[in-house]
Amino acid sequence: MTNEKYLVINGGSSSLKFALYSMPEEKELINGYIEKIGAPDCFWTLKINGEKIKHEAPLKNHLEAVETKMKELIDNKKIESTAEIKGVGHRIGHGGEYYPSSVLIDDEVIKHIEELTKLVPLHHPGQLAGIRAMEQELSNVPQVAVFDTSFHQTLPKENYIYAVPYEWYEKYGVRWYG
């Protein structure tokens, strides 16, 4: 059986966390995080075989962060080229009632994430920036959104409606997600 490599991303407003896995053995090959994207004191840390390596350089945006991350994967011999990556998974804060489980990212999914940004304004912009940067870097690789709100989607309605006016649920989508 051939090993395939999958990248997992957790984009933040000024950060990008990532890990590369080899499948099917579920082995983590490298993980890291980039902090203070857009600031002059931007830095990133990689963890390879238990050793932490820190770098510093200004990165203007999430696209530069993704480009830097991909270069680090190649420089550290975790991939020979980006063609080895077979899929990308993104942690997304809020899928509302649209997504009870993980989905392949397409234009409609992006539209829904943008729409739900009003509920998680600190997280979705960075998560969307990560998706868009990966689309540019790995345009032919499938991307999957994994929503925090999927976890309790199977709760009965009487368990996820808050004790607030029902109109808030109907009008604003206010409900318990876990």
Predicted regions and their residues:
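Conserved active-site "lid/cap" helical segment
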Residues: P40-K86, G130
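Rossmann-like NAD(P)H-binding beta-loop-alpha module
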Residues: E135-S139, A145-Q153, N159
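Short glycine-aspartate micro-motif
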Residues: Y6-V8, I85-G89, V144
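Glycine-rich phosphate-binding loop plus the immediately following alpha-helix
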Residues: V164-G178
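Short beta-strand-loop/turn "lid" adjacent to the catalytic site in phosphate-handling enzymes
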Residues: N76-H123, F151-I161
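Residue-level signal for inorganic ion chemistry
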Residues: N10, I34, V88, D148
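General beta-strand structural signal in soluble alpha/beta enzymes
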Residues: H90, P121-H124, P142-F147, G178
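Short glycine-rich, Thr/Ser-proximal phosphate-binding strand/loop in the N-terminal lobe
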Residues: Y6, S15-L59
